[in-house]
Each structure stands twice: as structure tokens, then as C-alpha cells.
Amino acid sequence: MLKLTKKQLIIVLGIAIVVVSAIGYAVYTQYFNEDKLEISYTAFLESTEAGEIRTVNLSEGPKLTGVFEDGKQFITDHPRTDSLKENLLLHGIQVRETTDQYSVVQVITFVVLIGGFIGVAIFLSKKNATQTSKEYDKMSDVEFSTQKDSSIRFADIAGNQEAKENAMELVDFLKNPEKYSRYGAKMPKGVILYGSPGTGKTLLARALASEAGVEFLAVSGSDFVQVYAGLGAGRIRNLFKKAKDKGKCVIFIDEIDAIGKKRDRGGLGGSDESDRTLNALLTEMSGFKGSEGIIVMAATNRLDILDDALLRPGRFDRQIEIGLPDLKARQDILQLYTQNRPIDPKVCLRGIAQQTVYFSGAKLENLMNEAAIYAAREEADFITEGHIDKAFYTVVAGEEKKDRSNIQPIDRKITAYHEAGHAVATKLLCPQNKVTKVTIIPSTKGAGGFSMNIPPDQMYHTKNSMVNSIKVALSGRIIEEIVFGPDFVTTGASNDIQKATEILGAMIKQFGMNDEVGMINYDVLFGRQGACDQRVMELTKLNMKRLYDETKVLLEKSLNIVEAVAEDLLIKETLKEDEINEIFSGFQSM
């Protein structure tokens, strides 16, 4: 039996509708629309009087029709008078009343046409729904980058030894599941890597997949944040479906906080798209077994804002911190990034590592890349310490501005004293810190100058060190006031004031370093509302004033050193560590 496709069936139906409509029109024309003799109303009355009319059809229209005694049809004007019907009946004429003599045919034709339109509309609607469904499925299909047989290994990652050991254990889980099943141990379903940006979270996840010899499916948390309802959850389901089809693999979700934030919205609950997406992720992670060889890894810079359900056992079982590298790790990272570069043998990587406190692995890579660019510009034989030194200040403060013709002499003087104040305050208050460079050359990052203050590696910040950091931040503005007067202080201290306020606010609100507030955390008690607390505002203001006055007394006593540094800056524009130390040595010997 011949079977028609849906498209062919619709075409046949359309042709049938047209044919039926044509037949209906033909019938209508043939039987109901014969030629009628059109006569005047006067002639109609005369024929009525003469008894020549057999039948008259009365309707509501402007015309009336009828049949003569000889069978011929006629049509004439309808006078619409009340006495017309009575007059016709008195003359023995048969009267038929109808609303429309052709209504049956017209109704049939109308029904057929409407039916045809409805059929076409249904077809188009279904076709559109199918197309919409396909588009939805297409949008629900998450795109991910894959990696197999990558050259990245744990040996290519320097620092974070503890994190690497954790990752190596997961590799062993994937390669030797029997070893752990013997003891009833289950492979963690999920691992969250957290830490500062640029510390190598993605690199570690890639290395894990590479070492285990499994596929690496990488997506971003923002890929699941969509305008259309249900798309995020659909993408989660599709991702896990594809992962299961591939067998053993590593799913890596970067910036998971985009979909995994805490769902507590001030007690109001939540049912928006991000909640549905998170629920889909939680469901999928609960729905597969560790024996399937799928590990879900995620990265975030903010572990504290993730939903508790995401961090419970059975979901992301392990949380591994990827911290900023310490001195040895920085040296190892620098060694790694200089392996295939022509480095001058005189370059001391340990010295660079000591200088790059709080640099992440990515920042160290950028440092060496900038140094290589400077060497390439000069077409030098080697990347020298000078190139690395220049790259260091470019990474930290931006490149030096070439055109400085628009800088007024008074602006240079204000900048020189401002930066000299920072340098002297650092040497006096934080002797353990290194002042490696002071300059009054503007940078492309908007700084009029800067004083490079490098602290030592340390695990904690003491109250004393935080107080001294505030004083150093305030010292530039204080010197402006001492030298130029209170009415001539400038906007150059805006970043310094911001930094000092942040440190002092944290001491009072978070770290319990204020006797009046005591050992409480304002953020826990009041949330963001605590930031506007009047009491905190007053305490911050009073303590800032006290520290400002103490620093002012110190700098007034050391004004001769500040002037010496400032005068040298006005001449040389840039002072390095040995030059600054020489100025201080000269005053200490006096």
C-alpha cells in the first residue's frame, strides 16, 4: 500500500480543497445562477395584473426574483413595501420567503475554504513547533572544548605540591580502580579547585586528564546562564549525557560560581533560571556512580559564595586550594618559563622570585613574556636582567609614557614629594620591606608615579603590620600637606585613601582588632547593611585621624630625608633600591 509522507499528504489535501471549491463554484453557476430576465418594476406590476407570474421569491436583498407562467425566470427591483406580499397573494401568485436563495452553496463553499485555511494553519503551526523544538535542542546542546592526548603533564606545573599530590591520587583512581575498590573506597565524584585568579586551576585539571589518558571536556559556568527558561538545565543534562557516552573522562566547569551561588535570597527562596540550572547539576552529579570513571572538576575564585548543597559529600567531595606560589614555587615557575628562552646566564631567578611576591603563575608567565618582547624589540642576544626588570614594572604599573611634555614643573614637584613620602615612610615603618624603585614618570595605567614596596613572604598579617601599611598609604598625602600646605593637597592620594580605608575597615569589622567593637564580625551579623553602620563609620574616622597625626609627626621629624629623595627624583626621575639605600645611609651616618 502506498504511504504518503506528511508533506505529500498536506499537498494532496490542498489540491482536494481547491478541486472541491471549483466544483462547488461550477454547481453554483450552473444551477443557481441562470440568466434571468431583468424587468422594470412597472413591467412586474403589469405582469402581476395580467396573471403572467407563477412564483415570486421575496428576500431581504434589493432585488426580488420569480418565475413566469411559461417557466422563464426574471429579476426586478424590490420595493420593500408592507402591502407587496398581500397584493401578490390576492392575484394568486405563489410567494416564497427566503433570506438568500444561494445561501446553501455559499455556506458549503465558505466551510470548505475555512477548512482549507485551518488545515494549512495547523500544518504551519506544527512545522513551526517542530522547528522551534529543533532550535531549542540546538541551543540546549552545550559547546565544550575537548582535549585528548595532551602534552601537559604534572611535571609542567611548578608549585602547589599538595594540590598536585591530590590530583595524582585521582589519576590513580582512574587508572587503577581495583586498587581502591578492594578497600571499599569510592572515587570522589567532584573536585573543586579554588584560589586566586591565575594560579593554574585549569592547567591542573588539564594535566590530570592528560596523565590519566582520558578525554577532557571543558565548559564555562557562564555557558549555562541563559535568557530562555530551561536552557541552562538542558545544557547540563546534555553535557553529562555526552560525558557518559564517552566513558571515562574529566568534566571541567570553569567559573562555577556563575551557576553555583548560594540560593538563600534573604529568606525569600528562589525559582529563577540559575536555581533550575544548579538543581540540574546537583541531580546529574547524584545520578552517576564513581565506577563510571567520570570526574567532575570545577574552578572558582570564591569558594565562600558557593551553595552548601554543591559542597556536600557525594557532590564535590574535595575542595583543593590552589594558592599563590611561595618563594621556592616562584623560582620553580620562573625556571619553567625560561627553559626554552635565551636567558642571560647572569640572570638570578631567585632574586626575581624574591621581588615577585604575590605574583600568580599566570602573572609570572606574563612577566617573562614581556621581558622576551623587550629583548626582541632590541634584537638582543639574550633576555637580560634589565629586560626582566623593565617588564616587572610594566606588569605592575604599566609602561612608561614617552611624551611627558605636558607635565608642569609644579606637578613634577608634587609627584616627587608624594612618592618620596611613601618611600621614606616604608623605610622607617616597614624595614623588612624592600623599596626597589621610586619614579615620577607617569605610566600608561594612569599613575603619575609610584613607589615600589615589596613585602616579604608571610603567612599572616599582624595588627602592627596592618597599621604600618595604613601609615605608608597616608604618607603621600601627609607630605603634600606639610610641604605645600593643607589647601594645596591633590587628588593623587585617592587610591592611597581607598587602600587605607579598606585595611582599617577590615581590622574593625572582620579581624577583631578594635577594642570598642570587640571580637565580632560585622559582615556575619549585619551582612551588607553593616557597611553603612554609623558606629563603624565613626570608629574608622577616629582611628584614621589618629594614624594620620602619628604619621605626620614621624614625617615632620624626617623631612630632610624626604627632601633629599624628592630632589634626587626631580633630577633623575627614577631611583633604584641601591640609590635609595645610599640616601638613607648618608643621613644615618650624620
UniProtKB/Swiss-Prot annotation:
It is found in: Cell membrane. Its EC number is 3.4.24.-. The keyword Cell membrane applies. The chain crosses the membrane at residues 9-29, 104-124. GO terms for cellular component: plasma membrane. It is a multi-pass membrane protein. Homohexamer. CDD domains: RecA-like_FtsH. Zn(2+) binds at H418, H422, D496. It comes from the Bacteria. InterPro entries: AAA+_ATPase, AAA_lid_3, ATPase_AAA_core, ATPase_AAA_CS, FtsH, P-loop_NTPase, Peptidase_M41, Peptidase_M41-like. This is ATP-dependent zinc metalloprotease FtsH 1. It comes from Alkaliphilus metalliredigens (strain QYMF). Acts as a processive, ATP-dependent zinc metallopeptidase for both cytoplasmic and membrane proteins. Plays a role in the quality control of integral membrane proteins.
